[in-house]
């Protein structure tokens, strides 16, 4: 059978799988269909709206901007989230909520994943809200799996509304929840003590998951079948929630797309030093944590987001992370829930280069530029300067012309920050007994041709539009809308929605008519996701061996040599 025949057969099988899904979950409606659906929750009544989805008659009830915590205003700006207050009457949940405070210009830089028409919403500190997308058909006695999406954006930018869950809800027959959390200094700056505890952005997501447990049933969701999933920083948060005792029992499956907490770009920092540096930049320097926080509380929120030179990360030795994530992993101190995770084949193809302000340097890149652009990240990893050329040599194995040098830098940055940490994390999960499903997304979306160079392959976050059914979204101003998708890309989106929702439903992405996806075991098999999916073996085996065996050995040898040189000098 040819590849084209195999692809056509797989496409037909997925359509049959989707049709069977709609038969298994019948479309008998309890009560009349209304364009402004209303739902009673323990906190009050909400009124949403109904939207359609392309290529299906199914409708989706959408509820936007529902608060899952009290607004973190005034003295609550740097506090852990508090439970939401009930409201009187009917709350309007039909309009898009504001985004959390962030640098909107930087947000607009990261919008061009697939849709350059994406709306940018207003910003506000009153932003701890979530959106719910639920198929209108409610079957008596049955509850749908719940998929809670955590957006990415380097913990600095992003919003829940930019990820429209209507197509995934309709085609996957799941309830999709998208959440917001405090970003930047509002979510992560810390004095390292009680005056400004860290990890507030993570705690916001925990609060949202608690809200889901107590409130999702009236929307047709099953609180006992919750999957958390996220991309980039969202994937980092998903993996963090797995390790935190605070989120125990709040979810039952997890998906990390291009992001895990052991990434080298996210290390626990000297919290007090970082807080002082930031405070000095806004004229709030103080030797006292209490005074520093009081000064920051007096500032206008929008004035605080203009300062870009601040390191954002998690803190340890608190209620969220009692120990460093690596130690929690090594000690297997986490629940063994089914876990699906993966990367793209060109993580630093374009988007992250643009976000990091180094895209303009990529056209004419010399070997000297390669080392210069890599040096800050390698230094952050505490790599001795004498060892850095070893890393460069490893990545220049395909030549030294400009295109090879550019590709070497892209691969190096992608491996350090995302790919190798994901592979290491998957090994920890497997050793602990989690059912693990690994993927590499390999398809270059056809829309890239409009604004990305021809050398960009499957860029960072490019799978999101397929997971969320971008070709089938009716709102073409949504970040992930993909109206120009080819027929093959539509089929890929249908397949990925089926796989992700099947995983949410059963803890396994395999199903009748879907491409076989092997569970990770000693064979180290994974799924190569593209127009013609296939099974791969030992993803980036050589690079993983370099970072986990070869390079550590060379560093040890270098340190031994340094010590041996010091002994004669001391004598």
UniProtKB/Swiss-Prot annotation:
Location of the protein in the cell: Endoplasmic reticulum lumen
InterPro entries to which the protein is assigned, alphabetical: AB_hydrolase_fold, CarbesteraseB, Carboxylesterase_B_AS, Carboxylesterase_B_CS, Type-B_Carboxylest/Lipase
Motif, Prevents secretion from ER: chain positions: 568-571
Enzyme Commission no: 3.1.1.1
Keyword Glycosyltransferase on entry: no
Superkingdom, taxonomy of origin: Eukaryota
Disulfide bonds: 100-127, 284-295
PROSITE patterns registered for this protein in UniProt: CARBOXYLESTERASE_B_1, CARBOXYLESTERASE_B_2
Location, primary (coarse class): endoplasmic reticulum
Family recorded in the similarity comment: Belongs to the type-B carboxylesterase/lipase family.
Protein name (Swiss-Prot/TrEMBL): Carboxylesterase 3A
Organism: Mus musculus (Mouse)
